[in-house]
Amino acid sequence: MSARAPKELRLALPPCLLNRTFASPNASGSGNTGARGPGAGGSGTCITQVGQQLFQSFSSTLVLIVLVTLIFCLIVLSLSTFHIHKRRMKKRKMQRAQEEYERDHCSGSRGGGGLPRPGRQAPTHTKETRLERQPRDSPFCAPSNASSSSSSSPGLLCQGPCAPPPPPPASSPQGAHAASSCLDTAGEGLLQTVVLS
């Protein structure tokens, strides 16, 4: 672990700081005084190098942060626009449905004001059939009118529904008596023929 730490430090620190930290301590006095001269001049360059490295690292992190924020903002904007568009579409659909319902309701109330509803059509139909049956049963054409029309214009028929033909006239009691007497005489003749045979 102790050997790895200085390696990491060497990689992290710039070369000027590495030269200063890892310089040999067994230098002579003249050598130290001679080294101080260029060291004082090289300290400015070392600071600039460190600043450049820090600025590069900071700028790279800033660029990454800006990119991440931009991507996040784009995602948020896309989601917000999608939700807003979805809400608008729902509102439009609701408005269209309401308009169609109002149109249908208004047209039904205007056009179907005098007409009966479909549930009430059956009784009106039965009433109509009853009304149709009544004029058929009630005689509009009297026999006197029929006779006069037939005498005046035999080719023309009676207008309107005419009454059914009258039933045959009932036989009078005299006719019934005559028929019974005829039957009696016929029966007596049959009996005489049977007896003679």
From Swiss-Prot:
Top-level division of the source organism's lineage: Eukaryota
Extracellular side: 24-61
Listed PANTHER family: CHROMOSOME 11 OPEN READING FRAME 87 (PTHR31870:SF2), SI:DKEY-183I3.9-RELATED (PTHR31870)
Membrane topology term: Single-pass type I membrane protein
UniProt biased composition (Pro residues): 162-171
Glycosylation: residue positions: N19, N26
Chain residue ranges for the region called Disordered: 94-180
Entry coiled-coil feature ranges: none
Protein name per its UniProtKB record: Uncharacterized protein C11orf87 homolog
Gene Ontology CC annotation, any one: membrane
TM ranges: 62-82
InterPro entries: C11orf87
Species name: Macaca fascicularis (Crab-eating macaque)
Signal peptide start-end: 1-23
Compartments, as annotated in UniProt: Membrane
UniProt key word Metal-binding: no
Organismal lineage: Eukaryota, Metazoa, Chordata, Craniata, Vertebrata
Keyword entries, A-Z: Glycoprotein, Membrane, Signal, Transmembrane, Transmembrane helix
Listed Low complexity bias regions: 147-161
Biased composition (Basic and acidic residues): 96-107, 125-136
Topology, Cytoplasmic side: 83-197
